[in-house]
Design a protein with these regions (language model features):
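Short, low-complexity, intrinsically disordered N-terminal segments
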Residues: 13-27
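Short coil/turn segments that connect the beta-strands within blades of beta-propeller domains
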Residues: 22-25, 83-84, 131-134, 168-170, ...
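Structural core positions within WD40/WD-like beta-propeller blades
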Residues: 24-37, 87, 134-137, 172
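Conserved beta-strand position repeated across blades of beta-propeller domains
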Residues: 18-20, 80, 128, 164-165
Length: 216
């Protein structure tokens, strides 16, 4: 058998990487991954998985960076890349804080971008960072879509509707139907009040160079 050229990337146990969209980086999160809802449950159970790790891997060099280290009771969510910077979400359940860090691509300058207090009933369900620009959102189990930062607002969405991404003052959602055949519909809502402005068969796909394609 021909020798296969396989390059080893030492990640200290993190075995799955995802593309950091818009950049040449990949990232990986261990244990509960990016699910901060599950992370909160682990914290409340005093589980042995009392924190997680977030790494970045450069391409094509394959250099591994671990720019931030979580303490007990702290968990990272999915990072996003926007305007040449990396944004990292961390939930600090000990102090009931949500912290967003920002970093350059070389991880030479990392600082707190914003720090928010967790609400009393915060369950971190579907809590995540999105772009463009960087926005902290969550969708509750009762189909209430909420923006937590930079501007707080909330509105109801359809049970089959899910948030995809933001384009400046527009919020892009997708909704699926089975009537009886499966199909999808793209929906554009206005930021921040959520008024539905447009809907069309298909879905909106963002290319690497920032083009928006209606596919379907």
């Amino acid at each position: 058998m021909e020798e296969i050229n396989i390059r080893k990337i030492p990640t200290d146990g993190i075995a799955y990487l995802r593309k950091l969209e818009g950049s040449d980086l990949f990232y990986g999160i261990d244990h509960c991954g990016d699910d901060l809802y599950e992370a909160k449950e682990l914290f409340e159970m005093d589980h042995r998985l009392d924190r997680n790790r977030l790494i970045f891997v450069t391409y094509p060099e394959g250099i591994v960076y671990e720019p931030l280290t979580a303490e007990k009771g702290e968990y990272f969510g999915d990072p996003v890349f926007d305007e040449g910077l990396i944004f990292i979400l961390k939930a600090d359940f000990n102090n009931r804080k949500l912290i967003i860090y920002r970093s350059d691509l070389k991880f030479k300058e990392i600082m707190v971008h914003v720090q928010l207090d967790m609400e009393e009933d915060e369950d971190c369900y579907n809590l995540r960072l999105v772009r463009y620009p960087v926005t902290l959102i969550k969708t509750s189990k009762d189909n209430l879509f909420r923006i937590l930062w930079p501007l707080k607002t909330e509105f109801e969405i359809d049970p089959h509707e899910s948030f995809d991404h933001r384009i400046d003052e527009y919020l892009i959602f997708s909704m699926w139907f089975e009537d009886p055949d499966y199909r999808e519909e793209a929906i554009i809502r206005r930021y921040p009040d959520g008024e539905k402005l447009w809907n069309h068969k298909g879905s909106i796909f963002t290319t690497d160079d920032g083009q928006e394609w209606l596919v379907g």
